[in-house]
Amino acid sequence: MSLTNEQIIEAIASKTVTEIVELIAAMEEKFGVSAAAAVAAAPAAGGAAAAEEKTEFDVVLKSAGANKVAVIKAVRGATGLGLKEAKDLVESAPANLKEGVSKEEAEALKKELEEAGAEVEVK
């Protein structure tokens, strides 16, 4: 008797995480492959899209640096967050401050935060 894809999916869905990890390890051993290799190869397929000009950028706070108070003030001004929310965001670095902004806005925000003492990355 051959199992359908639906039956296989249902069988896997009923397993615990530990059982699934053991299943993956057994499949890797039986077929001589690694799940990590398949995951690493996947981004290569999207390489053509990355060659296009990027129009939207994300501003990521990597660390607050030595002057955390100034960075919190800068984050509040840039995002419109309240004091507690801005403090929580700064303390949870690395964290996305803004997503999908123009290059000019991203660079301006990066400059403002770096002047306050933060380490910032534009992606």
UniProtKB/Swiss-Prot annotation:
One BP annotation, GO: translation
InterPro entries assigned to the protein according to its UniProt record, in alphabetical order: Ribosomal_bL12, Ribosomal_bL12_C, Ribosomal_bL12_C/ClpS-like, Ribosomal_bL12_oligo, Ribosomal_bL12_oligo_N_sf
Protein origin, superkingdom: Bacteria
Function per UniProt: Forms part of the ribosomal stalk which helps the ribosome interact with GTP-bound translation factors. Is thus essential for accurate translation.
UniProt-listed HAMAP family: Ribosomal_bL12
Keywords of the record: Ribonucleoprotein, Ribosomal protein
Organism: Haemophilus influenzae (strain ATCC 51907 / DSM 11121 / KW20 / Rd)
Name this protein carries in UniProt: Large ribosomal subunit protein bL12
Short name of one Pfam family: Ribosomal_L12
Entry similarity comment: Belongs to the bacterial ribosomal protein bL12 family.
UniProt subunit comment: Homodimer. Part of the ribosomal stalk of the 50S ribosomal subunit. Forms a multimeric L10(L12)X complex, where L10 forms an elongated spine to which 2 to 4 L12 dimers bind in a sequential fashion. Binds GTP-bound translation factors.
Gene Ontology CC: cytosolic large ribosomal subunit
PANTHER family hit by this protein: 39S RIBOSOMAL PROTEIN L12 (PTHR45987), LARGE RIBOSOMAL SUBUNIT PROTEIN BL12M (PTHR45987:SF4)
One Gene Ontology molecular-function label: structural constituent of ribosome
